[in-house]
Amino acid sequence: STALRKSIADRTAAFGEMLRQYFQTVKVVAAEDWTPEMSRAYDVTVMDGRPKAIKPAWQEKDASGKVIAYHSAVYLPESFDRPMVTIAEVGNTVGRGIGLKSDWYCLCLDADAHHWRAEHPIFKGPFPVKMTVRMCPTPSDAFHYAYFMDEPVPDSVLMWKVQNKGYQTHEGFRVGMVARPWGFEDSPDAEYISSGVCAKTLDAVAIGRHGNFLHWGFAASPADMTEEAKTVFANAIVYISRFAGQKPFVRKYNDRIATREYVKEQLYLSTREAWQERVKSDEEFAAEGLKLKKVVQEKQRR
């Protein structure tokens, strides 16, 4: 649609404008026009869209023709070793086929970061960073996942604003993505950097690295980033440039592979407490649905 094309054009222009404030040579191309070979001429590629697939999605069938497995499209060869920053769900899009840990835990990341590693290089330089932080109530959804945590979920956490807008306050705003934290750092080629306000655990990965890929889960265009976040984003680009040629060597092809945390979750879900919580949640969901139905019916009668 015309609106979608304009949105993409505006985002592309905003990224180009912001990056030129920090870097000498910047080339902007549409994701569908990009090829892996193009990245060899640049220190870092920032991927904010879906590139052309090098292998389409396909279904695996048994001898009788029954579908036994679904395989996602592949967008990069496993040999790709150039530094790349992926924005929001793009980390899952380009990463699933090559076993990246930036998988789709939840498309629910909003505008603020928390539980960041303050000592990490992206918060230090080379561009000077100022971080305005404030204590805020813990995201309510985190309490639903308290059984994952070794310590009680705190009532409040330090927050840092990454975006001036978010989907919770601005209807229709693009939503960010967090990756699963479990096993994220079980190999030296991956590191957790920050979490963010989302509907999952307090350690869900909003910013993280796996090999030569850096997942920036926040979805905002630079036009809606805070000035502080723009600087950290630029530092993230510099940081990932260090990992040229360093492909992931521990890959995760099954995003739902069982981990110790999975066992912990199954144990909790078998308790009466979990059942009561689910009943309450279902009742609240049903009540909200009836409320929305009533609103729609009233509009239809007008």
Predicted regions and their residues:
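Extracellular ligand-binding/catalytic regions of CAZymes and related secreted enzymes
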Residues: 175-177, 185-302
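Short low-complexity, flexible loop/linker segments enriched in glycine and/or proline
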Residues: 42-43, 100-102, 260-261
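Residues at the C-termini of beta-strands that transition into short coil/loop
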Residues: 32, 88, 126, 196, ...
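An acidic, glycine-rich "communication" segment
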Residues: 86-188
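A structural signal for well-ordered alpha-helical scaffolds and beta->alpha junctions
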Residues: 8, 12, 115, 119, ...
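Extracellular/periplasmic catalytic domains that process cell-envelope and extracellular macromolecules
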Residues: 37-40, 77-80, 115-116, 185-186, ...
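Helical hinge/lid and interdomain linker segments adjacent to catalytic or ligand-binding clefts
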Residues: 2-96, 275-280
